[in-house]
Amino acid sequence: MHIKRRFSITKKYSVIYADPPWRYERSKVQGAAEKHYPTMGIDELCALPVPELAAKDCALFLWATFPQLPEALRLIRAWGFRYKTVAFVWLKRNRKSPSWFYGMGYWTRSNAEICLLATKGKPKRQSAGVHQFIISPIEQHSKKPDEVRNKILALMGDLPRVELFARQKTPGWDVWGNEIASDITLAERS
């Protein structure tokens, strides 16, 4: 993924929602995601100036696959956050039937994806009624369910928020990604 080197970030966000284009380093998986979109290695992801986007009190919602869990935890630390919990578990259904979707997996056939919650400072939870499970059909490759944004809004409130690696513009959210017109510019930290 090409990233511009110059940037100026003046707005701070209380909520950062990210679905990184993870590059898999294992030979059996290489190329799967690359067939659909450009991917980034962990060092490239860690170099993004996400810490400069974060407000003093900020919640990060970060999608991770189970094979990339160590990298996701490293990324959380590199961006200046502390891991708290798994915010959401997406249980995937097939597109055209109510049956479960199963990917290839490593040892077992995979289904779920997780969205990790990490914090910087002391963001406040606005609702204790937000549930962790999301049961939703798969859509285009790697696209996450739209309802996640609504759950984040219910959990955190109507705060300044940005979606990184976005594929669509959602009202109330600033976005950054290579598949849409971005509201902000990010570049690697030097």
Regions found by a protein language model. Give the residues of each.
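Class I S-adenosyl-L-methionine-dependent methyltransferase catalytic core
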Residues: M1-S190
